[in-house]
Regions:
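N-terminal secretory signal peptides that target proteins for export/translocation
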Residues: 1-11
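Sec/Tat signal peptide C-region and signal peptidase I cleavage site
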Residues: 27-31
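Substrate-binding surface in catalytic domains of secreted glycosidases
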Residues: 38, 67-80, 145-305
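Conserved, mostly hydrophobic/aromatic
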Residues: 58, 99, 140, 215, ...
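Glycan-binding loop/region signatures in secreted carbohydrate-active enzymes
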Residues: 84, 101, 223-234, 270-349, ...
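Aromatic-rich peripheral "rim/lid" segments of glycoside hydrolase catalytic domains that contact
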Residues: 364-382
Length: 382
């Protein structure tokens, strides 16, 4: 064989090998008909018992960004918690443990995303974090690019820089996957926690989604201490007593789809906690009424033990929003939450719209797995 022919044959073999590697590397971890069940687990509130067989992914919350722009765990307690979660893979080898960076009031993103060098530094540190703890991917919970609502540093250019940061992370994670022989469903993953409306004004969802394996849509907290009235904080649809400020999970999903996000990349978030409002105007059982005080959050286990059908609280169902709520007429207290019925309906919505699965915040708030069992059963049934 002459040198030219040998070189051409080598080139064809090389191209075939590269193509084969790309197919292996780029194979998505979400197979047809297999839905993700993504649990956020807070390092400061680790459940005593975790059933890994009920989950596909655990998002460990949270790593932080140092003033120097590196991703790290803040202390030894968080490191021990992450190691405990990674050890669950011995029970469920298919479980993926993801390190989530950020969270509410977590600063550092705007600086980390600012320049090519700062993005590379952050991405390299994120990869090092995965290697050190044998974790499987990175999740970014930046609340929020281009907005100072949580009191963090922000810039107008966060909109473009967030996309550039995700592009850098994708490149670094893919390179590390190749180096470590992680292919197909085993490659390092990249996801984000997203919101709706204003979030889309300050991000390039139509461009950034190509770098992501999936998006955890935070379709909750629609009504909170910043809204003037009560309402369903995690309603699937708008309430029967619709007000102009109403937001809902279905609208959030449609925004992502309109931006070009493939349906299988959309993971619908549900809440394992409720939100309370006191001094509520006593009309329509407190739904979408002005209030005097925001009373914060109640985890679902607390609601089940102390509030639902107890202490004067009556459960109501809004069939338009597909959401439950509690009303105490004596204390004029309104509580909005998700329950097994509403979560079961959301699970059917996920399957009907061919979404990528369900996510929830946060595992320790459902101590008896009452809500998780609905998700696990629904996502795995035909």
């Amino acid at each position: 064989m002459n040198t030219g022919a040998r070189n051409r044959r080598f080139a064809r073999l090389k191209n075939f090998a590269l193509l084969f590697l790309c197919v292996l590397l780029c194979t998505p971890g979400h197979a047809e008909g297999v839905f993700r069940i993504v649990a956020y687990v807070a390092g400061w509130s680790m459940p005593a018992v975790i059933h890994p067989e009920k989950l596909t992914h655990i998002n460990f919350a949270f790593a932080e960004i140092t003033p120097a722009g590196r991703a790290q765990l803040a202390n030894g307690e968080l490191e021990a918690s992450l190691r405990r979660l990674v050890a669950l893979k011995m029970t469920n080898p298919r479980l993926k443990v993801i390190v989530s960076i950020g969270g509410w009031m977590a600063d550092g993103f705007s600086d980390a995303a600012l320049t090519e060098s700062s993005r590379a530094l952050f991405a390299d540190s994120a990869v090092d974090l995965l290697r050190r703890f044998s974790a499987d991917g990175i999740d970014l919970d930046w609340e929020y690019p281009g907005q100072g609502v949580a009191g963090i540093k922000y810039r107008a250019e966060d909109r473009q820089n967030f996309t550039r940061l995700l592009e850098m992370l994708r490149s670094k994670l893919d390179a590390a996957s190749v180096t470590q022989g992680r292919t197909g469903a085993g490659r390092y993953t990249l996801s984000i926690a997203s919101a709706d409306r204003e979030y889309f004004d300050h991000t390039e969802m139509d461009r950034l989604h190509v770098y992501l394996d999936w998006i955890n849509v935070m379709s909750y907290d629609f009504f909170n201490s910043l809204t003037p009235t009560t309402g369903h904080h995690a309603g699937l649809y708008r309430a029967a007593a619709t007000v102009p400020t109403d937001r809902d999970a279905d609208d959030s999903v449609k925004q992502h789809l309109a931006a070009g996000v493939p349906s299988e990349k959309i993971v619908l978030g549900v809440a394992f906690y409720g939100r309370g409002f006191a001094g509520v105007k006593p009309i329509d059982n407190g739904l979408e009424q002005p209030y005097e005080r925001f009373e914060g959050a109640h985890d679902y286990s607390e609601l089940a033990e102390k509030f639902i059908g107890k202490q004067g609280f009556v459960r109501y169902w809004d069939d338009r929003a597909k959401a439950p709520y509690l009303w105490n007429s004596a204390s004029r207290t309104f509580i909005t939450y998700d329950d097994p019925r509403s979560i079961g309906i959301k699970a059917r919505y996920v399957k009907a719209h061919r979404l990528g699965g369900m996510m929830f915040w946060e595992l320790s708030e459902d101590r008896n797995d009452e809500l998780l069992d609905v998700i696990a059963r629904s996502m795995r049934s035909k």
